[in-house]
Amino acid sequence: MPEAPTIDGGNTVWLLVSTALVLLMTPGLALFYGGLNRAKGVLNMMMMSFSAIGLISVLWWFYGFSVAFGTDVNGFWGDPGAYLGTKTFMAETDLWGATAENPSGIGVPLYVFMAFQMVFAVITVALISGAISDRAKFAGWLVFAFGWATLVYFPVAHWVWGGGIIGGDIHALDFAGGTAVHINAGAAALAVALVLGKRLGWPREGMKPHNIPLVALGAGLLWFGWFGFNAGSELTVDSVAGLAFINTQLATAAAVLGWLAVEWIKDKKPTMVGASSGAVAGLVAITPACGFIAPWASVLLGIVAGAVCALAVSLKYKLGYDDSLDVVGVHFVGGWIGSLWLGLFATNSVNAAITDVVGASDGLFYGGGVTQLGRQAIAGLIVTVWSFGIAWLLAFAIEKTIGFRLKPEAEVEGIDLAEHAESGYDLSLAGGSGGGSAFALAGIGTPAGAAGTKPASDESEPVSEKVAG
């Protein structure tokens, strides 16, 4: 008689807590992006993140989870009808990973795993918004988010984690989303930024962060929630979850030091924006590697990622693309660093699943040669090309139909007022309706975005200011 399915209380509670932690990351991202942005666009910046929670959650329940984690059809997507939203699953019997030989799987109800992966999809879409602040119509953003999630994120999640071509055939490693989340979102961010073009006045006018305490608060919430993102991706309560947890902390802390070192050397002044951005860069880089490398390699990864990303944010000035809040410089570059790091430092001495389950190889410095490094590079290239190409086509089509780029006069007025009829701050001297010098000082309704701004150039712009615009 086959064994009856049994829920594992420890695994289920851990994944529920991790889901809540990852959900918290999107409001944290809204605060982080909102603080980095100019005051006259802070609410729109936050709206793009909060709208992603609403839209992507429903899409994931209805068909996204099926496309990502349904039975593999051809290596490119899962069976769309496998977990269609019209179906109902029993918590006591429908357990994730269950097989005839192991009817309990990991002992976690299917709906818990669905919710955990749902919040990954949400924040991946929200990340893209940082590249197009102040100039994207809200309706255009919603259409783009719908199309990109459907055509890119859901299939790519299947390629990486659902038994598709990257995880199942190429045997590339990605513990929590370096390829599926960060390279994916970063490539899309670059494409949309190119289609929409530069903000008015960029880079001649300084576009500094309007609220640095908000940036720090958002970074802190991201750091806190990322423990669920990374350690939760083990799905079970075991030693690998502990490894992912400590590696996340070590890499992030080291990345703060790496970013600040670059600021200190280049600009002679370490900044709070730099520390916050360094933390995010470290979190991004450790994401694919947290459960596959030793702690010492995580520290080294953090230092490298913090320093390289601090330098990478300057590329937009040299190459002329307006990635407003440095999604490319932090998420795309950081995702690539972390993914390739696995080809050097992955070892089954800390996680036997590397060879026993995934079918991957140890990294170069653990005797595996360059095999895994090549696999990681191929996986990253596939996702980069697909995400960039589809995002560019979607953004171009939206611009030519309903319009994606905000009108110049609306951009000058401020996207919060133009698109949402509200502003983040009531700074009028009378406490009332709007004009006045206090608004100008806050960058609301002024072309330059702030009083007293200075011209920017790639030679003179401090690293901390490049992060913000």
Where does each model-flagged region fall?
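Glycine- and aromatic-enriched membrane alpha-helices
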Residues: 1-469
